[in-house]
């Protein structure tokens, strides 16, 4: 087959000379040297570009690069320069810790030791520990001035909102909302915002807080009605494509996920409304999207039947870089229980000594009254055990001890908890409220 045209031209230029073989050998040597010494080859290329004049013929450049193999001096210079750069580069140690479950061998061993300490304490010992250390515990040097100045915005007069950690609303008609930041050293990202269930007088404040803090998740641990009593205002639309309006806000349900047996997850679109209708200014404002997690049928001042549902919820909200808003009715019992489970789990995953009593005391210094009953305190331990069992941490020889703990736990619940009827979910969405009903 005849060679291409450009190949014929190249052969014509080099025919009759004895340099073609030498050039091929040089090209092969250059490729070999480039693969072995890429730094040297790059340095030579830059040096040639600096020394070459615009009028200099290309043949001169080829003569300057005839020596392709580096000398021992060049090799030692390159090695020394590379070593010097490595020594000058700061050493950064990256901590790779699984923050979702005990996965490494050291995490699993540390987790197992804690579970053994729970079995040694027993159900009765845990209840006694709560009564002795936490039942009457209040943090020292607390102030409640904002709480006392806003009685109409507090759901319960005996559930105090601390001044030191309260969420302050900005660019709003008031700076007060019954909500506190809960941030500890072990909690990931921005921690939690623990708050009471929205009221008719605070529902607009609630949505303003969600937008202000750019919260990506809302965890609701109560029903709007429980045992015939209102525990929380209907502040979000339950069904897909339904809309609920409040003065200044329009909330739309973008989708509902009911695949979990315990929780209902809704994707909500929150838009600010600056007039009676969505005017041109309102349309230009970007909507805020938030996932709403509703835990069905967690009894007030009690404990739910599922001990693994907390970890499923926490795994969904943990990746967010913004604080997670958590509320029940008062925002201290069920809310504090979920936050305590996360704080205890993260302490164990970081392989730090865990004292659950001290964890609760630290949480109460930010959100007072965290965990209201000894059963909720016991539920924290039970969930941590369940997590260890489902991860296969418990050996077979601890099976009998684990079953005894479960029997004692169930027996205590049977004697302490009265049978409570479950409040059914509403069959249809509530009507759109009027601004008069919600004096925000």
Each model region followed by its residue ranges:
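Cys-based phosphatases of the PTP/DUSP/CDC25 superfamily and their flanking regulatory architecture
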Residues: 1-440
